[in-house]
Amino acid sequence: MFKTFDDLADSVLAGTPADREAALAVLASEDDVLLDLVAAASRVRRRYFGNSVKVNYLVNLKSGLCPEDCGYCSQRLGSDAEILKYSWLPTDEAKRQAEFGLAGGASRVCLVASGRGPSNRDVGRVAEMTEAIKDANPETEVCACLGILKEGQAERLRQAGVDAYNHNLNTAPSHYEEICSSHTFQDRVDTVDSARSAGLSPCSGLIVGMGETDEQLVEAVEALRQIDSDSIPVNFLIPFDGTPLEGTWELTPQKCLRILCMVRLMCPDRELRIAGGRELHLRSLQPLSLNVANSLFLGDYLTSEGQAAEDDLDMIVDGGFQIVGQEDAKALRDRLRAHRAAHREAMGGAGAETGAGLPPCAGGGCGSHAAPEEQQVPVEQPVPAGVGAAQPAEAGVGTVRHGLRDDAGRPLVPTIRRRGAGTDALPNS
């Protein structure tokens, strides 16, 4: 067993990633040595990734009405969460949404659709979207996240230019039945294996804060090492009202940092991404987390709002980090403002800043098939009381707005996404 965290970092840098005993010791460490732990994990992060931060951008191609019963998910079967629900975005709208993220500094676009898994027709849609995005932006990486894949589908995506496939293991094998019964842990492993065999970079991570033990956290990361995930997103549970995990708040900012350090020390050379829920749980310690993680999602998530995209960029630059693919932060911000202004003007000026006139998103069944094209109709989404509507001005200027707060002022309800894909409002990018 190591004596200090620096000793542990020395061992990792010498070629021996943290084992189960060391990982559990990291998770059990006290708050008063947290900065020592972060400093040790930062040494490992900088050995493999220098001071770079990779920016990723999510485009929710199809939202809600999923037939699976994952207990953490606002899009699950039986969810009462008042999220946006719509069927497939048209290709040109998917490309447009992706380009907002690229203008905001992203080098990877993540194309995501709800459902158990795609039909061959759905794979064709995503292939077409990928080709459209890459024709206009050839240096862009595209990651697809469509659920459980059938035979030949990973190969079709790779042929279209998709670079990576995301399918999170989410939790430990021993905990999986506690959060989902409509598919198995092995189903997820098989899809990651299929993606890798087709030449796609495997992206797979976890969700923390779902009632798992420290032992199960380590077990989950051991499983990620076994499937050889290139990129590991760490999501922090967003406990949506209307889901089985509603009201579950188990994490502290310090615990979140310890989890990130544990993952970095167990998987030293893998992209480690702070993902959904980071604003809710890391809170004011978000900037510190970039000394451990080397990747994040820009702006909003699939069904909830993130912090303002410009705040994301400021957090990266103010921490002394370099955005992958971007040489100058000021030039990036200037391009971002020009990009937004051009889109507002194209939509009719100030009166159209919410995006009026964009193709409506269609309603229909989710799962392995979308609704037939001739049956697709716009779905109106009422904004429930207490939930802020998307801002008509520039997206990304405000802050995360949450309704309920505890005595310390911490948000207790995530803000539902009402801008970007599936809406007439400019995205947070």
Which residues does each PLM region occupy?
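Auxiliary Fe-S-binding modules of radical SAM enzymes
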Residues: M1-D32, R225-S429
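Zinc-dependent deaminase catalytic domain
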Residues: T4, D31-L37, S42, E212, ...
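Conserved, mostly hydrophobic/aromatic
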Residues: G15, A41, C70, L111, ...
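N-terminal pre-triad scaffold of radical SAM enzymes
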Residues: D36-S79, Y86-C110
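Active-site phosphate/pyrophosphate- and oxyanion-stabilizing loops and adjacent acidic/basic residues
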Residues: S42-R43, E131, C261, P287
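Hydrophobic faces of well-ordered beta-strands that scaffold small-molecule active sites
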Residues: V53-Y57, V109, V142-A144, Y165-H167, ...
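Conserved Radical SAM active-site core
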Residues: L77-G205, G209-M210, D214-I227
